[in-house]
C-alpha cells in the first residue's frame, strides 16, 4: 500500500504558507433549475460556509448550494435532477451529517451539500416487540437514538466512542468501539436501509431484498447512495456500568490479555486499549480520565520515559445484580497481568458511559481546544504484525512526540460481514489503531502529518498489511491497492448505483463523467 505522498506534500506546502487547504474556483452560476425544483425543504445559495468545514479542520471546499431537505423526496428530486443533467455537468452531491469527516470527505467543491440533520426529529420509531428495532433517519444523531430507545428499556448493541455522529455517517464507514469484538461494527447490526441512489431512486434494501445495494452501502463511503433511514436491532439496556482501567508496562502482556478477553465466552462488555507515550498529552485531550484517582492520572505511575499501556473495560449490570457483577469482574481480573496497584474502577449509568466523550468535548470547547485541526490516522493491522508495528512506531517514530490519544485494541473478524464494502485484513483477529491527534498551529499540523506519513511509509515497506479505516487517498492506484481483490466489485457497484459518479466526491475515489463510468444503455 503506497501512502498518499502527493496529498501530504500539498498539505505541507499550504501549511508552510500558514493556511489550511482551501480550494477557490471561479464561482459558476447556480443552475436556475435548482431554484425551480418543488421541495418540502429549501436550498441555501449564500450562507454555505459551514458546509465547507469539517472536524478535521484541514480542508475547505465551498459548495454552490446546500439542500435542507424536508423529506426524503427532496433528496431524491435533487439527485435525480443532477443525474438528468447528464455526464457533461460537473455538479456533484455530498451528504453531510454532523461534519465529522477529517479531510473533506463530506464536502463537494462547487457542488450540492445535503444537510442530513434536517431530516432528523419526528422520523424515529421504536418497535419494542419480540425482535425489537428502531427506525432512524440517516441524519439522526446516535445520542438521540440512545435517548429514544432507552424510553423502552432498549438500546442498539454496537456503538462508536462518540455519539454525536449521524446514523448514515457511521454506517457509511463502519462504526467501531469497544463493543465491536462481540457484536461487530455498527454495519454488522443493521436490518434494513432506505437509500437514495445516484440515479435518484429511493430503494428499500436488506439482506433479503436488494441485498447487493444493502451490502454496498454499508461501509461504502457514500459512493452508492445516500442512507436516509436505517433499521437498527435493539437489546435490553442495562442501567449501570462498572468502568475499569488498569495499566501495563509490557506490550506483550497487554495484547495477550486483550486477545484472551475478546475470545472468551464470559468476558467484559466493552474492551479498548490505549497507548500512553506522553502522560501530559493524555491528560489534555478528549480521552482524559473520568476521576482524579484514575491510574492514568496518578503521579505514582510515572513512566520514566517508558511507554505505558492502559486497558479499559466495562461490565454492564442492573442494581439488583451488583453482587453477581462483582464476582464476574473479579474472576476476569484474576486472569490478567496488569500492574496490581494500578486498578481503578467506578460505577456510572449506562448513558453516562456511552456519552463519555461528549463530556470531555464540553470541557475542551470551553478551553478553545476542540475546534482545532485534527490530522487523525486510523488504521487496521493484522494480529500477526502488531508487535512489529508497535516496536517501530511506539519505540521509534513516536518516541518523543504525541499530540493525542492512541487507541489500540483487537477485534474478531468473524463479527464482520465480508459482503459489505469495508476493507479489513485477512486474519481472524486484527487490531484497530487510531492516532487521534489535535494540532495547534501550522508547525504542529505539519509535524503530525509527517509522523502519519512515516507510520504509513514504514508499514508499507515492512509489509505490515495495514488497511486504513476512514481511508484517505487521492489516486485511483491508491484506492485500487486499498481494495485489492475487491476493487472490481466496488467499481461494478459504482456503475450500477451511481454511474455518473455524482455522489460523495470528497472521498476522491471516482471523478464525475469519467470515461470508466459510462451511462448504461
UniProtKB/Swiss-Prot annotation:
It is an enzyme of class 1 (oxidoreductase). Residues 59-237 form the FAD-binding PCMH-type domain. Residues 1-22 form the signal peptide. It is found in: Secreted, Extracellular space; Cytoplasm, Cytosol; Nucleus. It catalyses: N(6)-dimethylallyladenine + A + H2O = 3-methyl-2-butenal + adenine + AH2. FAD binds at residues 95, 97, 99, 101, 105, 161, 166, 172, 176, 227, 469, 507. Expressed in inflorescence meristems. GO terms for cellular component: cytosol; extracellular region; nucleus. Glycans are attached at residues 57, 278, 412, 418, 472. Its EC number is 1.5.99.12. Belongs to the oxygen-dependent FAD-linked oxidoreductase family. Monomer. Catalyzes the oxidation of cytokinins, a family of N(6)-substituted adenine derivatives that are plant hormones, where the substituent is an isopentenyl group. Possesses cytokinin oxidase activity toward trans-zeatin (tZ) and N6-(2-isopentenyl)adenine (2iP) in vitro. Functions as a primary strigolactone-responsive gene to regulate rice tillering, plant height, and panicle size, likely via a secondary response gene, RR5, which encodes a cytokinin-inducible rice type-A response regulator that seems to act as negative regulator of the cytokinin signaling. This is Cytokinin dehydrogenase 9. It comes from Oryza sativa subsp. japonica (Rice). The lineage of its organism: Eukaryota, Viridiplantae, Streptophyta, Embryophyta, Tracheophyta. The gene is CKX9.
Amino acid at each position: 500500500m503506497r501512502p498518499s505522498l502527493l496529498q501530504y506534500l500539498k498539505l505541507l506546502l499550504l501549511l508552510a504558507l500558514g493556511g489550511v487547504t482551501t480550494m477557490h474556483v471561479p464561482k459558476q452560476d447556480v443552475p436556475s433549475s435548482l431554484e425551480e425544483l418543488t421541495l418540502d425543504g429549501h436550498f441555501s445559495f449564500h450562507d454555505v460556509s459551514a458546509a465547507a468545514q469539517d472536524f478535521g479542520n484541514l480542508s475547505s471546499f465551498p459548495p454552490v448550494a446546500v439542500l435542507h431537505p424536508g423529506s426524503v423526496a427532496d433528496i431524491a428530486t435533487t439527485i435525480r435532477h443532477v443525474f438528468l443533467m447528464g455526464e457533461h455537468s460537473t455538479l456533484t452531491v455530498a451528504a453531510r451529517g454532523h461534519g465529522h469527516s477529517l479531510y473533506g470527505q463530506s464536502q463537494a467543491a462547487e457542488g450540492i451539500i445535503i444537510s442530513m440533520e434536517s431530516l432528523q426529529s419526528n422520523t424515529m420509531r421504536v418497535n419494542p416487540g419480540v425482535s425489537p428495532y428502531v427506525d432512524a433517519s440517516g441524519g439522526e444523531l446516535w445520542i438521540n437514538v440512545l435517548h429514544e430507545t432507552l424510553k423502552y428499556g432498549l438500546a442498539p448493541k454496537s456503538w462508536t466512542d462518540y455519539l454525536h455522529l449521524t446514523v448514515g455517517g457511521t454506517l457509511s464507514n463502519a462504526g467501531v468501539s469497544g463493543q465491536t469484538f462481540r457484536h461487530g461494527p455498527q454495519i454488522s447490526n443493521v436490518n434494513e436501509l432506505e437509500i437514495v441512489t445516484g440515479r435518484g431512486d429511493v430503494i428499500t434494501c436488506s439482506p433479503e431484498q436488494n441485498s447487493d445495494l444493502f451490502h454496498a452501502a454499508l461501509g461504502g463511503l457514500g459512493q452508492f447512495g445516500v442512507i436516509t433511514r436505517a433499521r437498527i436491532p435493539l437489546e435490553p439496556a442495562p442501567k449501570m456500568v462498572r468502568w475499569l482501567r488498569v495499566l501495563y508496562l509490557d506490550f506483550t502482556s497487554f495484547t495477550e490479555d486483550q486477545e484472551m478477553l475478546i475470545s472468551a465466552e464470559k468476558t467484559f462488555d466493552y474492551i479498548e486499549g490505549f497507548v500512553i507515550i506522553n502522560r501530559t498529552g493524555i491528560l489534555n485531550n478528549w480521552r482524559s480520565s473520568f476521576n482524579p484517582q484514575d491510574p492514568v492520572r496518578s503521579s505514582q505511575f510515572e513512566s520514566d520515559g517508558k511507554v505505558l499501556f492502559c486497558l479499559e473495560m466495562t461490565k454492564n449490570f442492573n442494581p439488583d445484580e451488583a453482587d453477581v457483577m462483582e464476582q464476574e469482574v473479579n474472576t476476569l481480573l484474576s486472569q490478567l497481568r496488569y500492574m496490581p496497584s494500578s486498578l481503578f474502577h467506578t460505577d456510572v449509568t449506562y448513558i453516562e458511559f456511552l456519552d463519555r466523550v461528549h463530556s470531555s468535548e464540553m470541557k475542551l470547547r470551553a478551553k478553545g481546544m476542540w475546534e482545532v485541526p485534527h490530522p487523525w490516522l486510523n488504521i487496521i493491522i493484522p494480529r500477526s504484525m502488531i508487535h512489529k508495528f508497535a516496536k517501530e512506531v511506539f519505540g521509534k517514530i513516536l518516541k518523543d512526540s504525541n499530540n493525542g490519544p492512541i487507541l489500540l485494541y483487537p477485534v474478531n473478524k468473524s463479527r464482520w460481514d465480508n459482503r459489505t464494502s469495508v476493507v479489513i485484513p485477512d486474519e481472524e483477529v486484527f487490531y484497530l489503531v487510531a492516532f487521534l491527534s489535535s494540532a495547534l498551529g501550522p508547525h504542529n499540523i505539519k509535524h503530525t502529518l509527517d509522523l502519519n506519513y512515516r507510520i504509513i511509509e514504514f508499514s508499507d515497506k515492512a509489509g505490515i498489511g495495514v488497511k486504513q479505516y476512514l481511508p484517505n487517498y487521492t489516486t485511483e492506484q491508491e484506492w485500487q491497492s486499498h481494495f485489492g481483490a475487491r476493487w472490481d466489485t466496488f467499481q461494478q457497484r459504482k456503475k450500477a448505483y451511481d454511474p455518473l459518479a455524482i455522489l460523495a466526491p470528497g472521498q476522491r475515489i471516482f471523478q464525475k463523467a469519467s470515461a470508466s463510468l459510462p451511462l448504461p444503455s
